[in-house]
């Protein structure tokens, strides 16, 4: 069993205070990893079906044989991981505004570990998606 609550990382960012934490939900007997921005819940790994669907639905409609995919926003990485689950993807570039989020993936402190960082098809870029896309 884990600690009931653990702050994994704290960073000041251009958007405010960013916290990565893990807490135990006793009723479900599981840990949940959460991202908090300025004391507001941003995301968690409690329910990731929508993040996975965000990748799988368009990938199912894509006719390209070896597509190069661009994703705006990395978060906990479930959308990117779902894209890479399609073996025909040639490359995936993920643009993330907050440097600590990219660092978490490189350090392997998230539930996916270093899965994205270790995949040679995946490039994580710090920047403003709308300015770079």
Model-derived segments and spans:
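Short, glycine/acidic-enriched capping/hinge loops at junctions between secondary-structure elements
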Residues: 31-33, 45-48
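The AdoMet/dcAdoMet-binding core of the Class I SAM-like
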Residues: 47-133
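N-terminal auxiliary segments of SAM/dcSAM-dependent transferases
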Residues: 1-33
